[in-house]
């Protein structure tokens, strides 16, 4: 598995500035949360193009759009339910009717120790 840095388009522009195209958006949201310490729980949404420097393959393009929501700063499971309900309504409003929701859980800290 490659890191986002390895998959990042980076280059110098005509002015000699070093630029990079974002490979995904979650890291930027988490960084903003860590730097600005907003009130919690903190909810954010984003949408936009992303770029990955990798061999193009079926279902994995170099440029793609990402829509996402993040809810940070709490372990309240109701916030997870809120995010799932938001996604469900989003797909419904797009007119998608053949949606199947499968829910799984990593468990809590004690549960995960059993799988290490």
Region locations from a protein language model:
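TRNA-recognition modules of translation machinery and tRNA-sensing kinases, especially anticodon-binding
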Residues: 1-116
């Amino acid at each position: 598995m490659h890191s986002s840095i390895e998959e990042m388009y980076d280059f110098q522009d005509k002015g000699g500035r070093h630029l990079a195209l974002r490979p995904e958006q979650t890291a930027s949201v988490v960084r903003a949360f860590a730097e600005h310490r907003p009130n919690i729980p903190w909810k954010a949404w984003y949408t936009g193009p992303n770029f990955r420097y990798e061999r193009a393959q079926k279902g994995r393009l170099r440029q793609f759009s990402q829509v996402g929501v993040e809810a940070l700063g709490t372990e309240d499971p109701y916030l997870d339910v809120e995010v799932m309900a938001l996604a469900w309504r989003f797909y419904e409003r797009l007119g998608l009717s053949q949606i199947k929701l499968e829910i799984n859980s990593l468990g809590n800290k004690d549960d995960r120790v059993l799988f290490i």
